[in-house]
């Protein structure tokens, strides 16, 4: 039985640039680095940055909706969003869903999101205004 997401490994084209972005700009804790990689954490999530010479930047309009969303406290959302904008990140989407969200790219074009909210809050909003064809399968969350 699956218990949780163990780790996320992201292929990067410039390890130093990525470590600076993920550690210094986003604030993940840096635990170790080596010639071709680094281990960081965000809460209980372990993130591995792995240098890969085959990694190529993919413009957001040429890729799908797959993205990685990180929980942010409500009071930290605006300051962090502004810091990212001031750092010149590329914004790939405007928020149109429940809860505050800021959608941006990392240096390699991985789609990321800052999000204020929880699954429980999202489901409550969906119960008020369900998506087309939405069926609820449990009362949990």
UniProtKB/Swiss-Prot annotation:
The keyword Zinc does not apply. Changing residue 113 to Q: Decrease in fosfomycin resistance. Gene3D superfamilies: 2,3-Dihydroxybiphenyl 1,2-Dioxygenase, domain 1. Keywords: Antibiotic resistance, Cytoplasm, Manganese, Metal-binding, Potassium, Transferase. It catalyses: RX + glutathione = an S-substituted glutathione + a halide anion + H(+). It is found in: Cytoplasm. Its main location: cytoplasm. Homodimer. This is Glutathione transferase FosA.
